[in-house]
Amino acid sequence: MLSSQSPSIYTVSRLNQSVRLLLEQEMGQVWISGEISNFTQPSSGHWYFTLKDDNAQVRCAMFRNSNRRVTFRPQHGQQVLVRANITLYEPRGDYQIIVESMQPAGEGLLQQKYEQLKAKLSAEGLFDQQFKKPLPSPAHCVGVITSKTGAALHDILHVLKRRDPSLPVIIYPTAVQGDDAPGQIVRAIELANARHECDVLIVGRGGGSLEDLWSFNDERVARAIFASQIPVVSAVGHETDVTIADFVSDMRAPTPSAAAEVVSRNQQELLRQMQNGQQRLEMAMDYFLANRTRRFTQLHHRLQQQHPQLRLERQQTVLERLRQRMNFALDNQLKRVVSHQQRMTQRLNQQNPQPKIYRTQTRIQQLEYRLAENLRARLSTTRERFGNAVTHLEAVSPLSTLARGYSVTTATDGKVLKQTKQVKAGDLMTTRLADGWVESEVKGITPAKKTRKKKPV
């Protein structure tokens, strides 16, 4: 039996779980550089590969929701920099890392340093807005810290010459690329502050790769810009290039040319502003003089209006106007009375019954005439229709047929005889003629011979 002093006994599951927790809690998230091998991507979309160097290797997994953010396709033998969590796959006891992000090793290392320095300086408050110094407006002298042979200096001088040719420019030439560049940039910033020759500084260079721009991601340069008593405008690379110097400077310009635009005044614009100001001043003076002239004219007119003769004339004018209004009112009143009288007379005439009686009699006569005409027309139409009916009836009447020499013979039972086979010898029959009836007895029957119909040829 085991004694009470025996060490704790782990099951395999508990051991793997404890090791996993220890790895995840103690190691946390780390950056790892290595070479990719055995890269696979099953249908799940996850990536599985081995990360190795000359002496060791480790299994890696990068799940689909993480690898979809990778901007390149990992290749066998490629050097990469990954950010990952250390863990243990408990069922098999395999030690592995779970990759969260992946970058190519060259720029990836620089990017990591960039992010670390950015976080450090931000935590110290070097990027805070409260420390940003305002740019002079207008600037009386501009200092430029850049390479004396680079395109950035040419662009800056070209813009300054175009916008403000009289603005003094002091160039502090430095290297902007290489191991010595950060130190030279720092010394140039310190020199400009020591001389007090200019009231704004442009620090920058033209575009390039991350390595080319790395001098402006140097901590020494960032702290020198922050410590500068002269406001600093950063102008590094193109608009898409963002460096530590951009965050710590008092203002970031997307390009060197834009920085020159920021620190200079457009003399042509100033000339237009002066011309506009002069025009506004002339307009204000014209308005002032016109206003004073109008006021003088008003006072002069009022003075003339106070003359006694003018007042008397105005009173006479008012009196004449009142007289005209009174005559007009009397005429209108008289017209209204006459008009009212005419309307009353017209209404009275309209109430007289004689015109109504006359109109009613006339209406009755018209109706009587129309009634008589309608009766005559209807009687004529009825007579015509009756005559047509009689003519039609006579045309189809059997009596008319009898009058033409035909007759109708009937048996004793009243049936009309049409064929000889309906009677026999000794039968009585009655014949209807046009003017009466004849009764006779059948003595003999002789059928008529049938005529043959000719066949068509």
Curated annotation (Swiss-Prot):
Lipid biosynthesis among keywords: no
Enzyme Commission code: 3.1.11.6
InterPro entries per UniProt: Exonuc_VII_L, Exonuc_VII_lsu_C, OB-fold_nuc-bd_dom
Protein name per the record: Exodeoxyribonuclease 7 large subunit
Subunit record text: Heterooligomer composed of large and small subunits.
GO BP of this protein: DNA catabolic process
Record's keyword terms, sorted: Cytoplasm, Exonuclease, Hydrolase, Nuclease
GO cellular component term, pick one: exodeoxyribonuclease VII complex
The keyword Cytoplasm appears for this protein: yes
Assigned protein family: Belongs to the XseA family.
Pfam families: Exonuc_VII_L, tRNA_anti_2
GO MF annotation: an example: exodeoxyribonuclease VII activity
Record's catalysed reaction(s): Exonucleolytic cleavage in either 5'- to 3'- or 3'- to 5'-direction to yield nucleoside 5'-phosphates
CDD domains in the cross-refs: ExoVII_LU_OBF
Species this protein is from: Enterobacter sp. (strain 638)
Compartments, record wording: Cytoplasm
Position of the signal peptide: none
Superkingdom of origin: Bacteria
Purpose: Bidirectionally degrades single-stranded DNA into large acid-insoluble oligonucleotides, which are then degraded further into small acid-soluble oligonucleotides.
